[in-house]
Amino acid sequence: MLTKGIESGDRIAFQLPGWCEFTVIYLACLKIGAVSVPLLPSWREAELVWVLNKCQAKMFFAPTLFKQTRPVDLILPLQNQLPQLQQIVGVDKLAPATSSLSLSQILADNTPLTTAITTHGDELAAVLFTSGTEGLPKGVMLTHNNILASERAYCARLNLTWQDVFMMPAPLGHATGFLHGVTAPFLIGARSVLLDIFTPAACLALLEQQRCTCMLGATPFVYDLLNLLEKQPADLSALRFFLCGGTTIPKKVARECQQRGIKLLSVYGSTESSPHAVVNLDDPLSRFMHTDGYAAAGVEIKVVDGARKTLPPGCEGEEASRGPNVFMGYFDEPELTAHALDEEGWYYSGDLCRMDEAGYIKITGRKKDIIVRGGENISSREVEDILLQHPKIHDACVVAMPDERLGERSCAYVVLKAPHHSLSLEDVVAFFSRKRVAKYKYPEHIVVIEKLPRTASGKIQKFLLRKDILQRLEQTCVEA
């Protein structure tokens, strides 16, 4: 990187699956003081152009081949839209780099650093992009001290040591994978087992073969494993616990884990403050089943009302956290930062919760207008903006509908421009595909209605649509 003109503080973006090359690039950034910007493998041209320009990335690493696509070839024609990007590097794990510089060539042509490059703990270490209520991805800025505080507290609470073997099925461009799958094992000298493409069979095989002691991920991962275990028993005696976050754990899943002797723990946090509430390993089962843990070491949690005044135990309000793990702000977004962070260092999550007398919290809902699909945030507004570009659609609103496996899926209510028009889910999927956005953002259910319910001031009454989709799903179950 240094030979390519990269300096301390420059942003280095890398869009890689769970490969060892991800770790190599991350460590290289740490060694020279560059800022890591890991990106989700599912992102396509639209998201990539936005994010690379937003963070002003100077170097971008992507696979030459992954899942029958050639990510490097997707970005090369878009260089004229990326004025800050100086170098595109093909990670030639599965296919040679024919149109760009290759990572293997960089490694072959260069020697290890001879002079140490030092950085301050409060300097920027990483920018993790997350979707939220504002639509386009936001860059969460984390310092070296943020990351160290987060992962040290996390490892201490769960008694993780060098003897543990982490299984990480989540994408490394997500906070879960980046922090808990890669960074935490570095800090304690543990081993990490990564998956580039998650399938229940591959994950179960690795859990058994590698004698993994802990697994981390969203509810769908454990849901799929439980389904497979019914047909294909496996020796998971080494597994100490499965840590689940990103969405509510269904009671059915928790009960099945209990019956199989798998300790299922809940963790709560966000990219901005990750993770800051975890249960204790020796807590009673009721804590695992009915709470999302209590504040990690060095972290404070409070529940506030609409005026951000602290509420007493048992009252529902917005969850807020403060501590050395809390991010320094959103990249180049001062207004969003000022709204999320106050002058005293409190981060207001937009999530609703209750806290009991012992300090344990339970997340009860969200103020934020997002859909959590298998642990991934989908901005309703972003999906709505794309729907409104469809030539047949006059008005649109996207809400979450419950899903047993993923927690939530997106449901689009649309008003057509002409009454005689028709619109199918297949039509919408084809339209989103042409827009080159990530597949997990596609609407998965379409309801065509005459008009959207609105207040007198013109705001859409989403709660009525959420109620409507629940009734429709219940009716479908009755008819089935």
Each model region followed by its residue ranges:
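Conserved AMP-binding/adenylation subdomain of ANL enzymes
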Residues: 148-165, 173-214, 224, 228
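Structural core segment of the AMP-binding/adenylate-forming
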Residues: 3-4, 32-104, 418
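Conserved pre-ATP/AMP-binding loop-to-beta segment of ANL
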Residues: 90, 95, 107-129, 136, ...
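Gly/Ser/Thr-rich phosphate-binding loop
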Residues: 187, 212-217, 226-287, 300, ...
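Conserved AMP-binding/adenylate-forming
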Residues: 1-47, 377
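Conserved AMP-binding A3 loop
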Residues: 125-149
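Conserved ATP/PPi-binding loop(s) of AMP-dependent carboxylate-activating enzymes
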Residues: 294-298, 307-340, 378
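AMP-binding/adenylate-forming catalytic core of the ANL superfamily
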Residues: 14, 43-50, 60-62, 215, ...
